[in-house]
């Protein structure tokens, strides 16, 4: 049976605090496109001030391309904690790449338990690329299977200090609105 989802489903996974595993869990939202039983999973992780729905056009195109070739795929786009539909953390100090990587590791384990993963691809934009490198390059994080393709967009292995300062100036500014 062929399944082609033209709209994503919103799902949640419970994640533990990296600093204090006995603390309350937080919910990370993720948007799922395509066949939820497909073993081929493409994870798309957004940038610092973005959300999983940023990948709607790409997810729709990936599902359609797979479908046209007779394949099934599941595209999963998390809202990193504190963004989109995900919960906020109680400790602001936990908003760091290791926390995000642990959350995505929990998500991958959940996806694998729902329908075993056979192929895993990763698309990471900016911070999403850093999270991908943390998940895939750290011995403490073990995805259910090796990533076949890692696509890094708008980032590299190093960050220039001036670029971080520039990001800090616009993220730290409150917006002015007429209403």
For the regions a protein language model found, what residue spans apply to each?
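A short loop-to-beta-strand scaffold at the N-terminal edge of the catalytic core in hydrolase folds
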Residues: 12, 22-33
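Active-site loop/oxyanion-hole signature of alpha/beta-hydrolase fold enzymes
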Residues: 23-24, 63, 74-123, 137-143
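Conserved hydrolase catalytic core segment
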Residues: 117-161
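Helix-rich cap/lid subdomain of alpha/beta-hydrolase
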Residues: 155-179
């Amino acid at each position: 049976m062929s399944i082609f989802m033209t709209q994503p489903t919103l799902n949640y996974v419970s994640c533990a605090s990296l600093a204090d595993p006995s603390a309350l869990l937080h919910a990370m939202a993720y948007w799922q496109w395509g066949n939820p039983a497909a073993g081929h999973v493409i994870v798309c992780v957004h940038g610092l001030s973005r959300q999983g729905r940023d990948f709607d056009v790409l997810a729709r195109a990936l599902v359609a391309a797979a479908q046209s070739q007779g394949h099934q795929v599941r595209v999963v786009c998390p809202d990193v904690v504190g963004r989109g539909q995900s919960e906020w953390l109680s400790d602001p100090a936990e908003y760091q790449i290791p926390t995000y990587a642990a959350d995505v590791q929990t998500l991958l384990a959940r996806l694998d338990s729902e329908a075993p993963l056979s192929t895993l691809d990763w698309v990471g934009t900016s911070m999403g690329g850093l999270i991908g490198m943390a998940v895939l390059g750290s011995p403490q994080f073990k995805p259910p299977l090796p990533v076949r393709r890692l696509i890094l967009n708008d980032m590299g292995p190093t960050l220039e200090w001036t670029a971080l300062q520039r990001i800090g100036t616009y993220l730290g500014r409150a917006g002015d609105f007429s209403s």
